[in-house]
């Protein structure tokens, strides 16, 4: 069994459902410390939702290669996994790593314990071949990415920024591939902005509408306009910004009562062509123009970020090409990731991991043939970046 596969299985065997790390970070710290990594725990959150965070960094100064402008590459990942769902529906126990049909089954197999294991082993191999690297290498790992994402990477980034930590390149180990490891990487993500709109009316008997004011009827024209609005046209890297309703709550449950209010939840996934502030202003303008009596609360889940083709993208592309022969596709599709926090202090962020077809599903799995190539791509990327750091 390869070291990468063995470490992946050891991580899967730890039932690390958010925010419980279940010992994953301790296991990883024990692997990293002998390589010269300084391992720092930056746990955060209340006792009933305590989040485990690890910042682990190896400085080029250890080998006397540090320069005033030494660059840092960081791998970002999460040890937490989503709940299993009905255990009886799994073909094998979700936290018992199981091989079947050329695949490794278990919760977290593809999201994202294979990626973490692959990077750790890639670092081991890289340092064995390059004992005096010219770049700093770091790992930022958390047990709160699948949950609220309040006390995880976000908190660590705030602390790193406060003490002036420099990050130049970041690889997030999210499962980005489609059919084969390396066929797609994410070089950005859309922003996410949610709103909860409460439209107030006057409750009354449905047979006497003249004595009431139906908030649903009042809201519909405004909602129709919002749904039809073209917010932007997107650009070469992002699709157009989208606005979608997710929930509508109104009524008392009775069929003869006009409700006193209706609550609508909605979400923007927005490109770099729009700003959160601009979208908020445009929504308020529509609601005001329709004369609604309303309250609206906003939650900004993350700003969009984009890494244009440059040092990091090219290093990863070269590594993928050398390992697999693939010309990888750059994409900004999909949901959010912790990359949105890291991009605040790191100018180049990409995401690369195994295929994502089974993530969050019953019988989550990763193909065995996708694991070693991922490790090799990470190692080759380190080699490319090390050459850049010494240029």
Swiss-Prot record:
Cofactor binding note of this UniProt entry: Binds 2 Zn(2+) or Co(2+) ions per subunit.
Gene Ontology terms describing biological process: diaminopimelate biosynthetic process; L-arginine biosynthetic process; lysine biosynthetic process via diaminopimelate
Cofactor: Zn(2+); Co(2+)
Keywords on record: Amino-acid biosynthesis, Cobalt, Diaminopimelate biosynthesis, Hydrolase, Lysine biosynthesis, Metal-binding, Zinc
Positions annotated as active site in the UniProt record: 80, 145 (proton acceptor)
Positions contributing to Zn(2+) 2 binding: 111, 146, 360
EC annotation from Swiss-Prot or TrEMBL: 3.5.1.18
Molecular function terms, GO-annotated: acetylornithine deacetylase activity; cobalt ion binding; succinyl-diaminopimelate desuccinylase activity; zinc ion binding
Binding site residues for Zn(2+) 1: 78, 111, 174
Keyword Lipoprotein part of the UniProt annotation: no
Pfam families in alphabetical order: M20_dimer, Peptidase_M20
Role according to the record: Catalyzes the hydrolysis of N-succinyl-L,L-diaminopimelic acid (SDAP), forming succinate and LL-2,6-diaminopimelate (DAP), an intermediate involved in the bacterial biosynthesis of lysine and meso-diaminopimelic acid, an essential component of bacterial cell walls.
Stated family: Belongs to the peptidase M20A family. DapE subfamily.
Assembly and oligomerization: Homodimer.
Protein name per the record: Succinyl-diaminopimelate desuccinylase
Organism this protein belongs to: Acidovorax sp. (strain JS42)
Gene name tied to this protein: dapE
């Amino acid at each position: 069994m390869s070291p990468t596969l063995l470490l992946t299985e050891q991580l899967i065997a730890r039932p690390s459902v958010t925010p419980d790390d279940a010992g994953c970070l301790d296991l990883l710290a024990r692997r990293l410390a002998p390589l010269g990594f300084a391992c720092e725990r930056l746990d955060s959150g209340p006792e009933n939702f305590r989040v485990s965070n690890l910042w682990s960094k190896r400085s080029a100064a250890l080998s006397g290669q540090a320069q005033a402008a030494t660059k840092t590459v960081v791998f970002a990942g999460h040890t937490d996994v989503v709940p299993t769902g009905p255990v009886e529906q799994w073909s094998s126990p979700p936290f018992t790593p199981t091989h079947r049909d050329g695949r490794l089954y278990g919760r977290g197999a593809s999201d994202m314990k294979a990626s973490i294991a692959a990077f750790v082993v890639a670092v081991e191999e890289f340092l064995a071949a390059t004992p005096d690297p010219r770049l700093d290498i770091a790992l930022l790992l958390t047990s709160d990415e699948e949950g609220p994402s309040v006390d995880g990477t976000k908190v660590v980034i705030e602390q790193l920024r406060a003490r002036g930590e420099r990050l130049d390149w970041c690889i997030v180990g999210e499962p980005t591939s489609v059919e084969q490891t390396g066929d797609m990487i994410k070089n950005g993500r859309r922003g996410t902005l949610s709103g909860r709109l409460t439209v107030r009316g006057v409750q009354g008997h449905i047979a006497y509408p003249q004595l009431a004011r139906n908030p649903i009827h009042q809201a519909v024209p405004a909602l129709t306009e919002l749904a039809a609005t073209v917010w932007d046209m997107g650009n070469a890297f992002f699709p157009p910004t989208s606005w979608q309703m997710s929930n509508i709550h109104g009524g008392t449950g009775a069929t003869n009562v006009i409700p006193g209010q209706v609550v609508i939840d909605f979400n923007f996934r927005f490109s770099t062509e729009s700003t959160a502030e601009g979208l908020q202003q445009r929504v308020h303008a529509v609601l005001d123009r329709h004369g609604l009596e309303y309250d609206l609360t906003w939650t900004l889940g993350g700003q969009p970020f984009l890494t244009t083709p440059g040092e990091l993208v090219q290093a990863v592309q070269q590594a993928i090409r050398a390992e697999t022969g693939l010309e990888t596709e750059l994409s900004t599709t999909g949901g959010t990731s912790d990359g949105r926090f890291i991009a605040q202090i790191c100018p180049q962020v990409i995401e690369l991991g195994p295929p994502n077809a089974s993530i969050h599903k019953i019988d989550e799995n990763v193909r065995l043939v996708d694991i070693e190539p991922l490790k090799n791509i990470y190692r080759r990327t380190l080699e490319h970046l090390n050459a850049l750091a010494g240029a």
